A protein has these predicted regions:
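Hydrophobic faces of well-ordered beta-strands that scaffold small-molecule active sites
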Residues: 3-7, 55-57, 88-91, 119-123, ...
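Active-site mouth loops of central-metabolism enzymes
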Residues: 22-37, 94-102, 204-215, 270-273, ...
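Acidic (Asp/Glu)-rich catalytic clusters
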Residues: 48-49, 79-85, 108, 112-118, ...
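Conserved, mostly hydrophobic/aromatic
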Residues: 51, 59, 80, 111, ...
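Alpha-helix-loop-beta-strand connector modules within alpha/beta enzyme cores
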Residues: 67-91, 157, 371-385
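A conserved active-site cap/scaffold subdomain adjacent to cofactor or substrate pockets
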Residues: 213-239
């Protein structure tokens, strides 16, 4: 099984889980941000040594609260690639509407060349209005009519940008005329003639896999048709199974079928301990800080009430609800094996990405989590952690 890691890139937060501290009342200085980066360097070396395939990082901006403080995943991933041997570095996710699509295409291509094909690209539409508006786009901010219109514009922008990126990567010359992007712009003079097309410099030296999160019905239909790999996170079992199978159905419909479990990734939040009590004692604060921070964005709306009914958009689950519904893992080695085995059997799972980055864990505790999963959970599950060889020319030295 391919096993990856995912980090939100959170500053050290020893008081995580304190119910009297609201997420927006937190404010951290630049020293705390730099300490997060130092932690990521250390954790990348651990992940590399233990055989994790890819370390995925998360893009966000202007987050004084300290939860997600890495604005450029390609740049930092390229740095980590220079400090590790085999680990791939991925972006989970580049917030595409907040980028100029041609700059994103250039930056990824250059980083992939420099690192010898060890970069993985993930693309998303974004979730945070503070970022989106400040960086020139819009994003939905809740479950209401205004958000629906913002979501429509955001989706259009994203899909056009992805068309531009793929044209630029794989066509020697390209032009594009859409609702939101026109390349080249009309009427550009250049050395005695007019510019009718563009050529991206550089291009990737390989066909690039593109990963995208799948949640909404529209995205479920878009991702397989666009040729992207699907990433699933924080879904109840019924919803997860339906979306997982729908991806394969669409691939079959368009004449590009997939094997069971192929081209789909399950992200699982996990904190394990030698005993269930130890895991709960140390994992509960991080779980509660994580859910408290993300609940206003609707991240846990896939949870269900005991009677099976839907929860509110801004639902904030307890750790017991997360564990009972198998949406997150906080428990013993055996608990983790049981839950991962459930998902493996349900989905024919081949690609697992573990989110270790519950707020409040120290550098040493995070390293311990990666060791426990690689050395105890996966062997007990009967799975070998398979790291893929690169399929690109060697890194530039």
């Amino acid at each position: 099984m391919r096993v990856d890691t995912n980090f939100f890139c959170t500053v050290p937060m020893p008081d995580a889980g304190n119910p009297s501290i609201s997420p927006t009342s937190r404010r951290y200085d630049n020293d705390a941000v730099v300490e997060c980066y130092k932690n990521l360097v250390d954790w990348s070396k651990t992940a590399d040594a233990l055989g994790y395939d890819t370390m995925w990082l998360t893009e966000h901006h202007f987050q004084f609260e300290g939860y997600e403080v890495l604005p450029n995943l390609i740049l930092f991933g390229m740095h980590l690639a220079g400090l590790t041997k085999d680990l791939r570095l991925g972006q989970m996710f580049n917030v595409v509407p907040q980028w100029h699509p041609l700059r994103l295409a250039e930056d990824f291509a250059l980083a992939d060349i420099i690192t010898g094909g060890r970069m993985e690209i993930g693309v998303g539409r974004g979730t945070v209005p503070r970022e989106a508006w400040s960086l020139g786009t819009v994003v939905a901010s809740g479950d209401n009519a205004m958000s629906a219109e913002h979501d429509r514009i955001n989706r259009e922008t994203f899909e056009e940008a992805m068309e531009v990126i793929k044209l630029a990567w794989y066509e020697e010359r390209f032009s594009y005329r859409g609702k939101h992007f026109v390349f080249p712009a009309d009427g550009i003079p250049d050395r005695g003639s007019m510019v009718n097309d563009l050529t991206l410099i550089p291009k990737p030296q390989r066909v690039v896999d593109i990963y995208q999160p799948v949640t909404s019905p529209e995205t479920i239909e878009y991702v397989p048709r666009a040729g992207h790999k699907a990433v699933y996170w924080l879904q109840n079992a019924e919803s997860q199974k339906q979306k997982w199978d729908r991806y394969a159905e669409i691939r079959e419909e368009i004449g590009n079928p997939v094997a069971p479990g192929e081209d789909r990734c399950l992200v699982m939040n996990m904190h394990v301990g030698k005993t269930r009590e130890a895991a709960m004692r140390r994992g509960r604060p991080g779980h509660d800080e994580f859910t408290k921070f993300l609940a206003p964005y609707g991240r846990f709306s896939s949870y269900r009430n005991p009677d099976g009914s839907k929860v509110p958009f801004d639902f904030n689950p307890t750790v017991e609800q997360s564990v009972e519904q198998k949406i997150q893992i906080v428990g013993s080695i055996d608990d983790a094996v049981d839950t991962l085995g459930y998902w493996r059997d349900l989905l024919d799972l081949k690609h697992l990405c573990i989110f270790f980055d519950f707020p409040g864990l120290s550098r040493e505790e995070m390293n311990e989590q990666m060791h426990l999963v690689a050395e105890e959970v996966m062997p007990r599950l009967g799975e070998k952690m398979d790291r893929r060889p690169t399929n690109a020319p060697a890194a530039l030295k």
